[in-house]
Amino acid sequence: MSTTGKGGKAKGKTASSKQVSRSARAGLQFPVGRISRFLKHGRYSERIGTGAPVYLAAVLEYLAAEVLELAGNAAKDNKKTRIVPRHILLAIRNDEELNKLMANTTIADGGVLPNINPMLLPSKSKKTESRGQASQDI
């Protein structure tokens, strides 16, 4: 049992108290404790504040959700139910801000964006004119 002091509050942990992770406190799915450990062991700085891993986890979770949403839309446009690297590439390259953020990133098995120079495409106006002249010659 825990002892009580002058204030009447129990000192120490009570039987009903439960450990709550920093991710749960922040309302995040990404692991704040693991990111904190990576920041400490990575020697990015001599000291790491308590808010830094929470903020970084929130940013990473937001970016992951954004890419997954756009990739899901790309998969749905292609009538697929599974997201593959091609859908992730299409999602990133078709979004202006994500494309700028990941400009030098290569996605394995992503392929390339479909792009044909308009000059190489056959022009429709020439075909219709030539057909019209041929019928008048006869």
Swiss-Prot record:
Residues 1-23 are annotated as: Disordered. InterPro entries: Histone-fold, Histone_H2A, Histone_H2A/H2B/H3, Histone_H2A_C, Histone_H2A_CS. This is Histone H2AX. One of its GO terms (molecular function) is protein heterodimerization activity. It is found in: Nucleus; Chromosome. Keywords: Acetylation, Chromosome, DNA-binding, Isopeptide bond, Nucleosome core, Nucleus, Phosphoprotein, Ubl conjugation. It comes from Tetrahymena pyriformis. The modification N-acetylserine is found at S2. The nucleosome is a histone octamer containing two molecules each of H2A, H2B, H3 and H4 assembled in one H3-H4 heterotetramer and two H2A-H2B heterodimers. The octamer wraps approximately 147 bp of DNA. PROSITE patterns: HISTONE_H2A. GO terms for cellular component: nucleosome; nucleus. There is a cross-link at K124 (Glycyl lysine isopeptide (Lys-Gly) (interchain with G-Cter in ubiquitin)). Belongs to the histone H2A family. Its main location: nucleus. Core component of nucleosome. Nucleosomes wrap and compact DNA into chromatin, limiting DNA accessibility to the cellular machineries which require DNA as a template. Histones thereby play a central role in transcription regulation, DNA repair, DNA replication and chromosomal stability. DNA accessibility is regulated via a complex set of post-translational modifications of histones, also called histone code, and nucleosome remodeling. Monoubiquitination of Lys-124 gives a specific tag for epigenetic transcriptional repression. The [ST]-Q motif constitutes a recognition sequence for kinases from the PI3/PI4-kinase family. The modification Phosphoserine is found at S123, S125, S130, S135. It holds the Pfam family Histone. The gene is HTA1. The modification N6-acetyllysine is found at K6, K9, K11, K13, K18. A motif ([ST]-Q motif) lies at residues 135-136.
